Amino acid sequence: MIQLESYLRVADNSGAKVIKVIQVSGGSKRKTGSIGDIVVASVREAVPNTDIKKGDIVRAVVVRTKKEIRRPDGTYIRFDDNAAVIIDKQNQPKGTRVFGPVARELREKGFSKIASLAQEVW
């Protein structure tokens, strides 16, 4: 469960390392987000000499959460960290690689490019 002020690790090579959520997309009253949800965030840490700088406002899709999510078959899945992948206006990833596992729910929510770039899909 991702809410305002949550810090997320960035799971791609776009140049950002850590982002801080400032808005969960999906309406003004929406409080929390989960895997596959789009968030607006501020870059808190970045790699030097890249396009994305500290303080930039970016859009990202959540790919891993510590809070477990229930699947339709009754199983649960959770990860060791909260992570996101930075995306552009067309919902395409800015980076060319995705690090760590991602949930297969991303493909169902229309982020098949991120799922195909990932090392593992759980």
From Swiss-Prot:
Q: Which UniProt keywords apply?
A: Ribonucleoprotein, Ribosomal protein, RNA-binding, rRNA-binding
Taken from the UniProt entry, a GO cellular component term is: cytosolic large ribosomal subunit
Q: Which PROSITE patterns match?
A: RIBOSOMAL_L14
Q: Which GO terms describe its molecular function?
A: large ribosomal subunit rRNA binding; structural constituent of ribosome
Q: Is rRNA-binding included in the keywords of this UniProt record? A: yes
Q: Which Pfam families match?
A: Ribosomal_L14
Q: Name one GO biological process term.
A: translation
Q: InterPro entries from the entry?
A: Ribosomal_uL14, Ribosomal_uL14_bac-type, Ribosomal_uL14_CS, Ribosomal_uL14_sf
On whether Ribonucleoprotein is a keyword of this UniProt record, the answer is yes
Q: Into which family does the record put it? A: Belongs to the universal ribosomal protein uL14 family.
UniProt function note? Binds to 23S rRNA. Forms part of two intersubunit bridges in the 70S ribosome.
State how it assembles.
Part of the 50S ribosomal subunit. Forms a cluster with proteins L3 and L19. In the 70S ribosome, L14 and L19 interact and together make contacts with the 16S rRNA in bridges B5 and B8.
Name the UniProt record assigns to this protein:
Large ribosomal subunit protein uL14
- Lineage, uppermost ranks: Bacteria, Thermotogati, Thermotogota, Thermotogae, Kosmotogales
Q: Which gene encodes it?
A: rplN
